[in-house]
């Protein structure tokens, strides 16, 4: 079967797993576009994206443009004479001029069942809103965000325990399957395109670190979803004696304590820290103190009891 010459655009781990599948396929990844290197951590060290690391290890030429409209970059991209561009969680809007460079167009692997959850946080949004299913959509890209015709989609169930990390791993598996299938259909010219229903569009919102502070005025159910959706980033937290305490795992206790204040610690034992919310109780099971490892609450019942005194309002 004919192989395609592919330019791949992506940045994160989710992207890198799809790139790895293309590298090991019959197709030819001739170049990669990824985000510029960033400074991170206390030492502000330069960090490479997972896609850049994988590309370096496989000797694939890399572009890291600050500006995708840069003429010099666009000319170099055009000279590659690639058949198709594949975009997976790249993080920047691709200009129309680039979209029009490739004879087979540009395709995007998106982690939702479009048109639900267009935008940058589809996985987190599906968990936050209690969706029972999500999936992968492969779309033909146009100059509007996530609005192109659907070329293929696969559904994936969401469990009540899924975090963004665990759900991402499920979606990577089916995303790779969908991507390779679509590339084969492109070669055979058998893709069936389906327009998105604009009436069903729901946009996902950008997530910021400040959004991770737990608000006890929300229900326990919403807080538990938030904790799963914000794992592994930015990780939900609450304040106790001026300490930022991160929450990695929780559960809902379906009891409402109307005689207790919102945010009040009503129990602290080997099963967790039980905190009253606007509706029902949130039981925190795993947490992390500043600069420390993630631990089960049962392991700090005695040593941290002053932080979690019953009756304390957080």
UniProtKB/Swiss-Prot annotation:
Gene3D superfamilies the UniProt entry points to: Formyl transferase, C-terminal domain, Formyl transferase, N-terminal domain
Binding site for (6S)-5,6,7,8-tetrahydrofolate: 112-115
Keywords: Protein biosynthesis, Transferase
EC number: 2.1.2.9
Disulfide bonds, paired cysteine numbers: none
Transmembrane segments: none
GO cellular component: cytosol
InterPro entries: Fmt (IPR005794), Formyl_trans_C (IPR005793), Formyl_trans_C_sf (IPR037022), Formyl_transf_N (IPR002376), Formyl_transf_N_sf (IPR036477), Formyl_transferase-like_C_sf (IPR011034), Met-tRNA-FMT_C (IPR044135), Met-tRNA-FMT_N (IPR041711)
Lineage top rank: taxon: Bacteria
Record-linked NCBIfam families: fmt (TIGR00460)
Record family assignment: Belongs to the Fmt family.
Protein's job: Attaches a formyl group to the free amino group of methionyl-tRNA(fMet). The formyl group appears to play a dual role in the initiator identity of N-formylmethionyl-tRNA by promoting its recognition by IF2 and preventing the misappropriation of this tRNA by the elongation apparatus.
Name this polypeptide is given: Methionyl-tRNA formyltransferase
Organism: Buchnera aphidicola subsp. Acyrthosiphon pisum (strain APS) (Acyrthosiphon pisum symbiotic bacterium)
Lineage of origin: Bacteria, Pseudomonadati, Pseudomonadota, Gammaproteobacteria, Enterobacterales
